[in-house]
Swiss-Prot record:
Catalytic activity annotation: Zn(2+)(in) + H(+)(out) = Zn(2+)(out) + H(+)(in); Cd(2+)(in) + H(+)(out) = Cd(2+)(out) + H(+)(in); Fe(2+)(in) + H(+)(out) = Fe(2+)(out) + H(+)(in)
InterPro entries recorded: Cation_efflux, Cation_efflux_CTD, Cation_efflux_CTD_sf, Cation_efflux_FieF, Cation_efflux_TMD_sf, CDF_Transporter
Classification via PANTHER family: CATION-EFFLUX PUMP FIEF, MITOCHONDRIAL METAL TRANSPORTER 1-RELATED
GO MF terms held by the record: cadmium ion transmembrane transporter activity; ferrous iron transmembrane transporter activity; metal ion binding; zinc efflux antiporter activity
Name of protein: Cation-efflux pump FieF
Gene3D superfamilies, per the entry: Cation efflux protein transmembrane domain (1.20.1510.10), Cation efflux protein, cytoplasmic domain (3.30.70.1350)
Keywords: Cell inner membrane, Cell membrane, Ion transport, Iron, Iron transport, Membrane, Metal-binding, Transmembrane, Transmembrane helix, Transport, Zinc, Zinc transport
Keyword Lyase carried by entry: no
Positions annotated to bind Zn(2+): D45, D49, H153, D157
Assembly description: Homodimer.
TM ranges: 12-32, 39-59, 82-102, 114-134, 156-176, 178-198
Amino acid sequence: MNQTYGRLVSRAAIAATAMALALLLIKIFAWWYTGSVSILAALVDSLVDIAASLTNLLVVRYSLQPADDEHTFGHGKAESLAALAQSMFISGSALFLFLTSIQNLIKPTPMNDPGVGIGVTVIALICTIILVTFQRWVVRKTQSQAVRADMLHYQSDVMMNGAILIALGLSWYGWHRADALFALGIGIYILYSALRMGYEAVQSLLDRALPDAERQEIIDIVTSWPGVSGAHDLRTRQSGPTRFIQIHLEMEDNLPLVQAHLVAEQVEQAILRRFPGSDVIIHQDPCSVVPREIKKFELV
């Protein structure tokens, strides 16, 4: 599982970096030729794309390293750090766009040959849609937070390129402030995406529990297993591709230790079949030692 995860995540990071570099060169030419502030917005975004994707590429490779003596739980948290760094990069580009857009709203300037800008934007739109489709497939397979953050960023690029097409079309017909207005709207959307991405990264760094649906699946597996009378103290978190799951099983007092161990092993394997690659810790408690107030299962 880890080999497949590493291969897919690395390919997604390389694809994003390569596409960002190619589009940057095209957008530099288009901005120089047309003077469009919307294309400048796209150019700045491509610079951020490159910085973010390179950060992803380096951090993902680090996060895939196996656990060592100093990092006994592995290096998966590096993915959350990459997502947090991306959110800061993107916020900076959004603020730059605000300033540039306001300046052009106050003093609009006609652009040269919007047709060139439209052609470049169509190319960027098609390439970005292809990349986002590939990234979405990788996220479904790996649940990588770094790739998900990159995908959210490029999804905003799809909307941005669509808005730029409209702005260039309006400018072509003499609505010169449309270029700056759309660039301002793009900046607002980019900032929103950055804040959302940063929030998710911080939650992961703070060891937020797995989604309710996944925790409920764990509860269902455990409480329906023969030999398990109940369960409590479920604790979960995720670091990179690895889910960490801890739970206490309640068993009959007179159950032999060997049999209790066998039941716990079976439950662990059942959880691993549902969530491959997880780190599962199970503690067995005799029913008589479980306080009455925690008999009823609660998510922790």
